[in-house]
Amino acid sequence: MKRLIIFDMDGTLYSLNAVLPAVYEIQIDFLNLKKGWSREKIEAYFNDNCVFPFVSEKSRSATALFQSEGLDAKEWNDFREARFPFDAVVPSPTVSKELMDDFDKLGSCVLVTSNSRKNAQRILDKIGINVASFDSIVCDDTTSFNRPFCKKDIFEKLLCDYSMRPHQSFSIGDRYSTDIKPLLELGGNGVLVAAPESLSGVVGDMSNGKLMTCDAYRYFPSEGITSESLWG
């Protein structure tokens, strides 16, 4: 059976624990520069919009938030690229080319991230994953969609581009609202991972047709889809 497997990057392919506090400061600095808001106002605004300095499955994209404020996407990408804490990006010992090859055997693999292409490339290099591991990569500065950055729109186009029915698609990510819910709304499947180390269990269970909710990940099946139609 054909499958479309869509990966998030930050928090999914590598841990954000050491990266997120520094990225949060970059986001504060950018909004202070563009809006002139105080730190207290920015922190309250971020909290109201689920942009946090810590890992949370409720987190949402600061990039999409900035674009909804009318801030220039390229200016934000340039600002972030110049300050991103690449030294804090730590590869997971279980996320490897071999792991991605195992996913590739199950279907077409696509990376969707609100990072710029340059940032995404540097992060993938740091964690030892080749861009060739993905059939395509969609970044904030490579998508032609209207702003703000919207994963649901991107997922819908990917289903069309790869000639997939929704139940043949799987979104794998660490944030429910941003990575999982948009594809569920289109009729697809979601796999919410607890950490990058969860991916080895996901690919094993997908290979055996036994995705489930467990300590490592939570599986959100396409509504009304049977195991026979998913794995037959």
Language model segments and positions:
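N-terminal helical cap/lid subdomain that shapes the substrate entry/recognition surface
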Residues: K2-E98, D102, K118
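Glycine-rich, phosphate-binding/catalytic loops in enzymes
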Residues: P21-E25, I127-I129, G187-G190
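Anion (oxyanion) recognition and catalysis
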Residues: F103-D104, L184
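Short active-site oxyanion
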Residues: G107-L111, H167-S169
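Conserved phosphate-coupling serine/threonine residues in phosphotransfer and NTP-handling enzymes
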Residues: T113-N115
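Substrate-recognition "cap/lid" segment bordering the active-site pocket of phosphatases
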Residues: R117-F170, L186
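Acidic, Mg2+-coordinating phosphoryl-transfer loop and its flanking beta/alpha structural elements
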Residues: I172-G209
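Short acidic-hydrophobic, aromatic-tinged amphipathic segments that line or gate anion-handling sites
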Residues: S207-S222, T226
